[in-house]
Amino acid sequence: MRKGLTVLAMAIVSLGAPSCIELKQPQEQVQTEEFKWVVDTFDDIKVLQYKVPGFENLSLDQKKLIYYLNQAALSGRDIIFDQNFKYNLPIRRTLEAIYTNYRGDRTTAEWKAFEKYLKKVWFANGIHHHYSSDKFTPEFSEAYFDTLVASVPAEKLPHDFGSAEQLTAIIKPVIFDPALYPVRVNQAAGADLLKSSAMNYYDGVSQREAEAFYARMAKPGDPQPISYGLNSQLVKQNGKLTERVWKTDGMYAPALEKIVYWLEKAAEVASPVQKETIEALISFYNTGDLKEYDRFNILWVQDTASMVDFVNGFTEVYGDPLGYKASWEAMVNFKDMDATRRTEIISANAQWFEDHSPIQEKYRKKEVKGVSAKVINAAILGGDCYPATPIGINLPNADWIRKDYGSKSVTIQNITQAYAESSKGNGFIEEFIFRPEDRERITLYGTIGDNMHTDLHECLGHGSGQLAPGVKGDELKQYGSVLEEARADLFSLYYMADPKMEELGLLPDAEVAKAQYASYISNGMMTQLARVELGKDIEQTHMRNRKMISEWAYELGRRENVIEKVVSDGKTSIVVNDFDKLRTLFGKMLREVQRIKSEGDFVAGRDLVERYGVKVDRKLHEEVLERYGKLGIQPYSGFVNPIYTPVMEGGEIVDIIYEYPKSYTEQMLDYSSRYSFLPSVN
């Protein structure tokens, strides 16, 4: 919700404080040189950087607020590594110690393989792929790893397990044995989702035990339920289940104390409204009280006027197969005032869209409250938003807060710009889009359509509809996130082709919707398979969502050939033959997905996801991988951050300026040096 849309249709195109300086330098220097969008490429990853347009025009207090919030965003980096897997931190630190201290030959194939492995670990915030969640397979030998570790002075290695020998006895099997911790998040039907997942939100606890534990906590009929379990690790100690709460005197305390320090600095330069919001977040971090988290979210969602805004906290539950526990993430941003006008039009007409939605009337909101939307430029990415980041966000996640106070939706303009600019001329459209008219539409309207899809998905899709009386919202369990993303996507797809979009001046004509439909269906049924290892099922939430929608629409429209698989010169393409009928199908599908969510119909939701969103046609998969590989395109992208530095005069900050890191490796090592506050074992 909510972190919606991590490159959605764009996947089709590409599929401690810093030192201060005394001399004020003109900010324009950052923009005068030709901008380098691509910083690094390795394996299936392309690392980009993003512009920060308009930063120089902010007031000094706004710049200082961004700077302090940036420091808070970077201070939690270790948390997401540890949440993803309990051995990520000692492994990362061992690899970094090798990289910075090894004095041997750095030109060999095995060294290059080691370097690639380290870059992948940085990118994924751990040893499991950030998207598929499969464990990485090192392309260097255990013997070579032993040689590398032996070359590092003992004092440079993590000491949490004792000697270097004791350290490697633990981490070496974890790295090299494919049977150990093979997947970070397992969603396979019939498995114990906790015991078969490597994520670190539970320790020694079975799925049945966890579900029963939180079922006992829930208060039936509570109109304002807290998000039980959101900010804790559930463990079994002496045979008894207990929560280790993430707070400044609990688990992750050293990092959370640093985050709070910088939030306190931010509160000093914030407006009165934002100061109250930040202080509520500080209270939540200090107490771990989820009622304080709700208070923070209510204050945050009601603040729609601030130029500078942020996300900081335990937010999204995609990393927990049961959907209780949230990863730590952060993002600091400020408004793009010109682009925000389009989202203001959408939010101003939210009631019209709700009233005309094809869902059952009883599941429509009678009064849409507090829908706010804006277009932003990211200033920093952190935690689970870094290096891979969403292009749109809709928060808060609690259904009762959304119903009573509304939601805040953002489209991240400078991130979508970086994706688009870095993907120009890569040959993708020519290879996978069969019809010339579809190619032309996507070339002309693809970016407009992607941005509008994101706006509708985040601003209206997630905020639409309501639960039936007595439904809590967690009944769909491991399928809840997929179905929620599908609900928002279907809402967006349905309205993309509505005449209201042209009437409101949001889209120039119906060709934009056709471009979006053609690219979305092709991506969902086919081209996103470039992101999946051959022989694997689809595991990632957004990919399951897109495949489910596309395959379901294909089957529903099969009799009338609404969508067609075309084979020409041995190459498969997906073609939409009837855009109007496809829109009608999207409406029917939205009606059913909303019913499933509103009623908490686990069986129907499970059957939809498992039937259409998981399994992969091996022959088609092989074809996609072969064709995609010939283009030399990396299917995943992420980012390095700008580096912000205070300009000092007489001991006072008089400006904040920014520059870009020299390399991806430089930034990762810098962050590990200056923002690593947790022990290796937590």
Please describe what each predicted stretch is:
Residues 30-94:
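N-terminal-proximal low-complexity accessory segments that begin disordered
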Residues 16-19:
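C-terminal motif of bacterial Sec signal peptides marking the signal peptidase cleavage site
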Residues 59, 271, 481-498:
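An active-site-proximal "capping" alpha-helix that borders the catalytic cofactor pocket
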Residues 578-682:
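Extended, compositionally biased alpha-helical segments that mediate assembly or anchoring
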Residues 465-486:
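Post-HEXXH active-site segment of zinc metalloproteases
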Residues 80, 493-599:
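Long, well-structured alpha-helical subdomains associated
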Residues 123-235, 241-440, 446:
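Contiguous, non-catalytic segments that form substrate-binding/exosite surfaces or channel walls
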Residues 459-471, 495, 499:
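Catalytic Zn2+-binding segment of zinc metalloproteases
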